[in-house]
Amino acid sequence: SALMASPHAFGQAIPQALQQQGSTEASIKEKRNAWTVGVAGGLMSGSYMTFADELAKALDDGDNLRVLPLVTYGAASNIDDLLYLRGVDVAVTQSDVFEYFKNERKIWNLQNRVHYIIRLPVSEVHILARRDIRTIEDLRGKKVSFGPAGAGSSLTGTLIFQRLGIQVEQANIDTSQGLAKLRSGEIDALVRLVSKPIDFFSKIPADANLHLLSIPFSKKFADYY
């Protein structure tokens, strides 16, 4: 291992030959960075990271355009990263996340600070619960995982339960750990927001005694969905 820094940081005199080499290095660095775009994707297990990776493969053009997919906390944190994190130029997120940042977080001039580029496949929200829980209303007072903080499910799930007036004990647990806790009975349900193709649900054994709950549409969240 080694700790390295630019010689400029130490104020050392640089020989002329090294200065010329440094000039060449600087031009290479400038060219490489001129058309490099950082895309905030999401969690490694999520569909948004898959989108970012596919964009990188499809748009790659060497030094003319290089797309770098970035692993992040998820769709809800991606707008924060786009606004404030160095190296993030593009973010994959959801329309409800944007509306939340604009209307609830009241981020100043958000509609002019970020711009819509392209529509991606629609995300679908799923609530996976034990078989003895028949409806979403049965989760009142129960422990529900909304996925990791910053993930799209953490925001969308919270909005849905709040608007329906169903109070639950909210937990923010990684999806794979959440599934294990659901099967062991430590939690009662989990919220997962994904876009196709994701094989998370198809890999759950048929004898796991779990099922998906219906989410009734309500005018209470019609302003978002």
Where are these regions (language model features)?
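N-terminal hydrophobic or amphipathic helices and topogenic motifs
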Residues: 1-68, 111-113
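Bilobed "Venus flytrap"/periplasmic-binding protein-like clamshell domains
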Residues: 34-61, 123-184
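Loop/turn elements at helix/coil->beta-strand transitions in domains of secreted/extracellular proteins
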Residues: 64-65, 87-89, 141-142, 187-188
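Early extracytoplasmic/lumenal segment of secretory-pathway proteins
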Residues: 66-77
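Structural recognition of the beta-strand scaffold that forms the well-ordered cores
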Residues: 68-69, 89-93, 126-128, 146-147, ...
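Membrane helical hairpin/interfacial module
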Residues: 82-85
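Pocket-lining segment of extracytoplasmic ligand-binding domains
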Residues: 95-96, 104-105, 167-225
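A structural signal for short loop-to-beta-strand junctions that line the ligand-binding cleft
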Residues: 108-120
